[in-house]
Amino acid sequence: MYIYIVVNKNAIYIISLSIGRNLKMAKVFKKTSGNGQIALYLGKRDFVDHIDSVDVVDGVVKVDPSALNGKKVFVYLACAFRYGSDDLDVIGLSFRRDIWIQRIQMYPPTGGSATQTPMQESLMKKVGEQGYPFSFQMPTNLPCSVSLQPGPNDAGKACGVDFEVKAYVANEADNADEVIEKKDTCRLMIRKIQYAPANNKAGAKAEISKGFMMSDKPVHLEASLEKETYYHGDPITVKVKINNESSKVVKKIKITVEQLTNVVLYSSDTYIKPVCSEEFGETINANATLEKSFQIMPLLSNNKEKRGLSVDGRLKDEDTHLASTTLSQGDKEMQGIIVSYKVKVNLMVAGGLLGGLTGSDVTVELPLCLMSPKPAANWIKDQFHRGEVTWVVFIDPIKVN
């Protein structure tokens, strides 16, 4: 048995987890079609990419067969890149490209009934005899949910990668000539997300020696990060070592965090945007040294006006943050949006009497992994969803004065 204590500003909740057969659902996500014939049920909307596997997307579709008139019911899971507004679909222009899609016929059912997950068992108890469970297994080379931040004057839905579970009534699963009316569909948007690895490795280190005109010896620069992965909202510590053997003067140090967004669709295009830049007035004279740590903090709140910046996908009006680094196995091609970060340490060196002719910058770059930690509550949900924890007891809250 595990005991968890969750604290917020209003109460302390003691959560006890055990192994058992009874199952208790905290929340169910439901969407019903306009005609009321079908309803889509999911137990969660965030599905975790564990690099070597992805959470199974499992749910239930409720079907009222009395008004189908011989039609069938299907459900699909689609990963798509949206690069335009839905409003343009009315004139025959679709600005949405499916990266991956899978369809399942739900009614009439085909084949034998598969083993239900604990989540589906709970949903079936809620839905009743008209429920039909479904499961999708996403491949590991799909991108995560990422949106491209619109500009201050942009309207409509943001561009980016999204995931959609959709149930619909039709004669065929995928017929371009068949018109499926909106009242015959219901859909729920979900997210595919990644969390920071449990084991944080040592950070990157880079060094360079650079010579200058009118100077016999170089400037040595070494920069390193304390750790490989930093969490959103945490300060990033950059350790800098400088040995100025030249006759030049280092006027100041500039540290920048850049976001690299690689959009892979018909071609591969990379967009680089600074998300944090700080200048430090450290002067290192000729034949002097410096060893010091500096802190910077990239935040979305300081980049709200930057159009095209990658942010983590969100549902409805939830708060979000800068897009997390995309982790992959490296041996599979990935389409969509791939996000990475780097830290640039730049020494601004004075040119002396000849100005820019004899002065130059000294720069090193460090790869940075920027992600969110896995919340304890998500860990509990994952264990529950996988069947490793099959009931949850919430003890009445202890009020805090």
Located regions from the model:
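Intrinsically disordered, low-complexity terminal segments enriched in Ser/Thr
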Residues: M1-I5, K9
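Intrinsic-disorder/low-complexity loop/linker signature
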Residues: K9-N10, G59
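Compositionally biased, low-complexity segments
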Residues: I12-I14
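C-terminal beta-sandwich interaction modules and adjacent acidic
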Residues: L17-N401
